[in-house]
């Protein structure tokens, strides 16, 4: 805490609150943020699953201040050290349940994503979760399964690395992803 402000004071002073944490913590953080925001502040999330979050905040009196988003970009790395300049440019962002967000909150978030060059798709939370499961989450599950199978069956690790070509390396790359991020998904 470099500012000397409490978490609540920091949230109250922010114009935009961005929740970019593992998905299992986002609903609780979203409720906490919505409990503190005023009619001018906006809360967004970056999580890859939306249905549970949508259900939890659906009846919140400040639901309109929330815009559910999922930027469709990531690597097997996580944390601030994984940041990459220009990573989001040209990548799609999904905005979920946009009709539940206040118009001014939605306009601000659309402006941010348009400014950094992200095409916007609009979907319901359910649609987003279904489509993302097929195009993103299944590839991670497959990568984890292959990596675990190879490590279990091929006991001599030096043979794995000596014999494996680019195909194995490419396929299991996602298995390096943080379990803290992927287990809740």
Question: Where are the regions that the model predicts?
Answer:
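Short acidic-hydrophobic, aromatic-tinged amphipathic segments that line or gate anion-handling sites
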Residues: 2-7, 121-123
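C-terminal active-site/capping subdomain that shapes the small-molecule cofactor and substrate pocket
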Residues: 183-185
């Amino acid at each position: 805490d470099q500012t000397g402000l409490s978490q609540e004071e920091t949230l109250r002073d922010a114009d935009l609150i961005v929740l970019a944490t593992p998905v299992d913590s986002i609903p609780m953080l979203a409720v906490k943020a919505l409990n503190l925001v005023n009619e001018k502040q906006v809360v967004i999330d970056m999580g890859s699953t939306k249905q549970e979050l949508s259900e939890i905040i659906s009846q919140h009196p400040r639901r309109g201040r929330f815009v559910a988003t999922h930027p469709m970009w990531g690597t097997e790395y996580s944390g601030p050290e994984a940041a990459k300049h220009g990573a989001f440019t040209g990548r799609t962002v999904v905005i979920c349940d946009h009709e539940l967000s206040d118009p001014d909150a939605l306009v601000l978030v659309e402006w941010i994503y348009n400014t950094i060059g992200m095409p916007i798709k609009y979907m319901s939370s359910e649609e987003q979760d279904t489509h993302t499961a097929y195009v993103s989450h299944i590839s991670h599950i497959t990568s984890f399964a292959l990596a675990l199978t190879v490590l279990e069956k091929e006991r001599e690790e030096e043979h794995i690395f000596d014999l494996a070509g680019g195909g194995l390396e490419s396929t299991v790359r996602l298995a390096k992803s943080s379990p803290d991020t992927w287990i809740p998904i």
